[in-house]
């Protein structure tokens, strides 16, 4: 009798497991891949998505996956949406306001009564990671691959991915210069297949400051910098910040550590 019960229970659990696995697979299948959406694999030769196409895809991800939320932090210099994509587990998304409050308390010692409360907040909070892409628009790899990263986090049921999503709130800014991301892609696609295909954009890829938008982290003169500081850094005080760049086809290839504290008073240490 006991054997029959255990056997039946085992079959029931197996059926439940198969159902859950199928549901997870179905969920992943319902999130469109970058390739199915754009018509080519992101990162493939001679293919660039512009900002309009990329932001539309992020809205599709948010509609298809409960792990993804898209916020427009403001408008760029030329009126494009400046977006931040927040990715975490559905459970964390459902208590995002609570987790945000915990993060803000951890960032301000005046809001924590002592060591005991500090440890409690650390235990129930989540690690906040900010990834930014594409401040220099001719470094096309960052804004393009953001779509692949966000798709994987939105759809994958790999154990490692679920572990990350359970413990991390990812704030992803797919382009720090959406105007340039749009212009560079549009220029390339306009001349694709002609003798001018490899020609550089003939104007600055940021309307006012060109390449030097990366030098605006102390003066905050540009709208894109202001949106990033107010909507990400000051709004969340992330523990980890990863700014993605791309090397050119020539020139120096060696990076040296700073061997000194990178003191920047406008960025959390």
Could you describe each region identified by the protein language model?
Residues 8-24:
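Bacterial N-terminal signal peptides
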Residues 41-48, 132-139, 214-218:
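Second-shell loop/turn segments in exported
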Residues 30-31, 74, 83-91, 98-106, ...:
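Surface-exposed loop and adjacent secondary-structure segments within mature catalytic domains
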Residues 128-130:
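Conserved beta-strand elements of the Class I
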Residues 30-86:
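Mature N-terminal segment immediately following signal peptide/propeptide cleavage
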Residues 59, 63-66, 150-158, 218, ...:
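Sec-exported extracytoplasmic/periplasmic mature domains
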Residues 1-6:
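N-terminal secretory signal peptides that target proteins for export/translocation
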């Amino acid at each position: 009798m006991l054997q029959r019960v255990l056997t039946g229970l085992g079959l029931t659990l197996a059926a439940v497991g198969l159902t859950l696995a199928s549901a997870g697979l179905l969920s992943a299948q319902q999130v469109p891949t970058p390739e199915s959406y754009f018509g080519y694999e992101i990162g493939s030769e001679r293919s660039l998505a512009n900002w309009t196409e990329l932001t539309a895809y992020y809205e599709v991800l948010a509609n298809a996956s409960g792990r993804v939320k898209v916020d427009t932090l403001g408008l760029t210099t030329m009126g494009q949406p400046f977006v931040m994509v927040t990715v975490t587990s559905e459970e964390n998304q459902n208590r995002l306001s609570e987790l945000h409050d915990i993060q803000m308390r951890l960032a301000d010692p005046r809001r924590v009564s002592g060591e005991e409360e500090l440890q409690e907040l650390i235990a129930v909070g989540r690690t906040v990671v900010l990834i930014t892409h594409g401040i220099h628009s001719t470094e096309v790899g960052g804004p393009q691959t953001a779509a692949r990263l966000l798709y994987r986090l939105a759809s994958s049921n790999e154990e490692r991915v679920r572990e990350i999503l359970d413990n991390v709130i990812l704030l992803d800014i797919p382009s720090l210069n959406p105007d340039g991301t749009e212009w560079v892609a549009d220029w390339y696609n306009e001349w694709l297949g002609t003798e001018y295909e490899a020609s550089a954009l003939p104007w600055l890829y940021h309307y006012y400051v060109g390449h030097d938008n990366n030098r605006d982290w102390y003066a905050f003169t540009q709208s894109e910098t202001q949106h990033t500081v107010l909507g990400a850094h000051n709004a969340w005080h992330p523990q980890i910040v990863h700014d993605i760049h791309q090397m050119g086809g020539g020139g120096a290839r060696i990076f040296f550590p700073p061997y000194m504290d990178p003191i920047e008073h406008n960025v959390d240490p």
